[in-house]
Amino acid sequence: MQEIATIAYLKIHTGKEDEFRAVARECRDAVRAKDKGTLQYDWFFDPDGTTCVVHERYADSDAMIEHMGNLGETLGRLLGMADLSLELYGAPSEEIMRAVEGMDVKVYGHFLGLRD
């Protein structure tokens, strides 16, 4: 299976910045405790703290599905405080594509890399 990478852009709703950061920590803690195939999960904020960018990498599509299931309600709370746009890199499974259906998602297929 092929690695899957994502870059999530989250525009945090006004007044929700502190709550967003608290729920982000819950997400990180759940990933540490539960995810088996998550290879990268790094959070970044712009200088004013209103936009968050999350870099994620998964061993394969199954690992990304596992991740989404492990976060469940916590991810739902986070997405209730921010507007999401997602870039998805690799060859995501049909299950992933169904899971992100209706979201603002752009998919990019792999072309070249150092390991090719």
Where are these regions (language model features)?
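Hydrophobic residues embedded in beta-strands of well-ordered beta-sheets
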Residues: T50-C52
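Hydrophobic alpha-helical membrane-association signature
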Residues: V23-A24, H67
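An amphipathic, aromatic/His-enriched active-site/gating alpha helix that lines ligand/cofactor pockets
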Residues: A30-L39, R57-K106
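Short beta-strand micro-motifs enriched in acidic
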Residues: F44-D48
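A short acidic, often aromatic-flanked loop/helix-cap motif at beta-alpha or helix-coil junctions
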Residues: E94-I96, F111-D116
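Short, surface-exposed ligand-recognition loops at beta-strand->loop->(often short) alpha-helix junctions
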Residues: K11-A22
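Active-site-flanking beta-strand signature of metal-NTP-handling nucleotidyl enzymes
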Residues: A5-K11
